[in-house]
From Swiss-Prot:
One of its GO terms (molecular function) is translation initiation factor activity. The keyword Cytoplasm applies. Keywords: Cytoplasm, Initiation factor, Protein biosynthesis. The lineage of its organism: Bacteria, Pseudomonadati, Pseudomonadota, Betaproteobacteria, Neisseriales. One of its GO terms (cellular component) is membrane. This is Translation initiation factor IF-3. Coiled coil: none annotated. IF-3 binds to the 30S ribosomal subunit and shifts the equilibrium between 70S ribosomes and their 50S and 30S subunits in favor of the free subunits, thus enhancing the availability of 30S subunits on which protein synthesis initiation begins. It is found in: Cytoplasm. Monomer.
Length: 173
C-alpha cells in the first residue's frame, strides 16, 4: 500500500532479486543482489532507492531518501514558478469611442500584449446602435490594422448578443 503513494520504492519494498547499483557519488557498482545492496545501504546509513524500476535489472541508488524527496519537491516548485499563466485582458469599446479614448485603449492593449497576455476586444452596442453594426466592424478593423505588427488575430470579429468580440494574441517572436 505504501509503495503506491511514493514515486520510488525504497529498501525492503524493492521486489527484484538483483539490481544495478549506483553509489551516493554516482559511481556504478555493477549488478548485485538486493540483500547485498541493502547491507551496503545499512552500512553507509543511507537508503536503497529504486530509481528506474522498468530497467532490466532495476537501477537502484544509495542515497538519503529524505534529501532526495526534498530536492524533487524543490525542482517541481521551481518548474511551476517558471511557468507563466497567460491571462485574458478585456478592453471595451463603444461605436462612438472618441479619438482620445481610442488612443488610451490602444496604449493599454499594447501594454497587455507586451506582457504576453491575450486581449479580448469587446464592442458594446446599446439601443439603436444595433442598426449601425457596420460602424462597429469598421472600428474593430481599425484596431486590427493598428496592431498588425505586434499582434495576431486569434478570433475575428463576431457578434455575441449585443456585442461584437475579437480575440488578439501577441505575435510569436
Amino acid at each position: 500500500m505504501i509503495a503506491q503513494e511514493r514515486e520510488a520504492r525504497i529498501n525492503g519494498e524493492i521486489t527484484a532479486k538483483e539490481v544495478r547499483l549506483i553509489s551516493e557519488s554516482g559511481e556504478q557498482l555493477g549488478v548485485v543482489s538486493v540483500r547485498e545492496a541493502l547491507a551496503m545501504a545499512e552500512g553507509q546509513d543511507v537508503d536503497l532507492v529504486e530509481i528506474s524500476p522498468t530497467a532490466k535489472p532495476p537501477v537502484c541508488k544509495l542515497m538519503d531518501y529524505g534529501k532526495y524527496k526534498y530536492q524533487q519537491a524543490k525542482k517541481r516548485d521551481e518548474a511551476k514558478k517558471n511557468q507563466k499563466q497567460v491571462q485574458i485582458k478585456e478592453i471595451k469599446f463603444r461605436p462612438g469611442t472618441d479619438e482620445g479614448d481610442y488612443q488610451i485603449k490602444m496604449r493599454n492593449i499594447n501594454r497587455f500584449l507586451a506582457d504576453g497576455d491575450k486581449v479580448k476586444v469587446t464592442l458594446r452596442f446599446r439601443g439603436r446602435e444595433m442598426a449601425h453594426q457596420q460602424l462597429g466592424a469598421q472600428l474593430l478593423e481599425r484596431v486590427k490594422e493598428d496592431l498588425a505588427e505586434v499582434a495576431q488575430i486569434e478570433s475575428f470579429p463576431k457578434m455575441e448578443g449585443r456585442q461584437m468580440v475579437m480575440m488578439i494574441a501577441p505575435k510569436k517572436k
